[in-house]
Amino acid sequence: MNNNLLIIAGPTAVGKSDLSVDLAKKLNGEIISVDSMQIYKYMDIGSAKISKEEMGGIPHYLIDFVDPSKEFSVAEFKDLTTEKIKDIQSRGKLPILVGGTGLYINSIICNMNFAESDKDEEYREELEKIANEHGNEYLHEMLKDIDLESYNSIHFNNRKRVIRALETYKLTGKPFSSFKAKNSIYETPYNIYYYVLNMDRAKLYDRINKRVDIMFEKGLLEEVKNLKAMGLTDDMQSMKGIGYKEVLYYLDGKISLEQCIEMIKQGSRNYAKRQLTWFRKDPRAIFIDKDTFASEEDISSKIINDIINS
C-alpha cells in the first residue's frame, strides 16, 4: 500500500473545493477537510461549507461533526485525521487534505507532538486559585525549578500558558518546552504532494468581497440568530470565527449592518494574507498561480502529471 498524501491548500475563496473534487474523481481519492470552521454543525453559510451537490459524490470527512458549543483542539484533529488517512489508504484510495487552516495541515505533515491533548481540570482550578490569591508572578515562579526554558520564554502575565506548562509537567513528568522541541518541522510519515493555490491579489480580494455578499444573500444573519437562540455566545471558540463574531456585534446593536459587512470583508482579506504567509514558510509547498493556467483542467492535469511522474 502506498503512503501518498495529496494536499490542496490556499487562502479563503481561492477555489480549492472544485479543483479537489475534480482531482478526487480522477485519482480515486477521498477528501478530508482541513478547515477549522467547517468542522462545526449548524454553521454552514458563514464557513462557506461545501454542499452535498458540490461534493460531486466524493466522500468528504471532518465536516459538520462538532457541536459549536464544544471546544475542539488541533490534537483532536490530528488523531481523527490520522485514523481517516489510514482508513482511506487501506481501501486503496488516495487521501486528499483540502482547506486553509495551516496549523491543521502542519499537525499532519510535520509530525507534531501535542502535549495539549491531555487535561487535568482539577489541577487547573487549583492553579487558578493560587494565581488569584498570590498573583501571576507567584504562579510563574513555580515553573522555575521544573521547566526553566518555559519559565524564561513565557511571560508571567500569560496565566493560561503558565498553567498549561505546569499542568503538562504534572501529567507527563516532562517539561512543556520538551514537547515543543520535538516538533520536527519537515518530518512526516507520508509521501506528500503539497500544492497551494494562489491568484492575483486584487482578483482574490474581489472574490472574497463577493463571497461575503453572497453569504448575506443566503441568510447569514438568520444563521447567526439561530446560533444565538441555541445559547451560543461570543466567548465560544466557534463564534470567534470571521463572519460570526461580527454578526453577533450587529445583532447586539454594537455596530451597523454596513459596518458588519465591511468588517467581515476586511477580516477575510487579512486572513487570506496571513494564510499565504503561513504556507510560504514550508519549502515543500508548491505554489500554483491560477492566473498562469488557461483552465482548472490544466491545473488538475499538472498535479496529476506530477504525481504520476514522481
Curated annotation (Swiss-Prot):
Single GO term (MF): ATP binding
Region (Interaction with substrate tRNA): 35-38
Alphabetized InterPro entries for the sequence: Dimethylallyltransferase, IPT, P-loop_NTPase
Site features described as Interaction with substrate tRNA, chain residue numbers: 101, 124
Residues the record lists as binding ATP: 10-17
UniProt GO BP: tRNA modification
Parts of the chain that traverse the membrane: none
KW Hydrolase (keyword) present: no
Enzyme Commission number: 2.5.1.75
Binding site for substrate: 12-17
Family listed: Belongs to the IPP transferase family.
Quaternary structure, from the entry: Monomer.
NCBIfam families recorded: miaA
Name of the protein this chain belongs to: tRNA dimethylallyltransferase
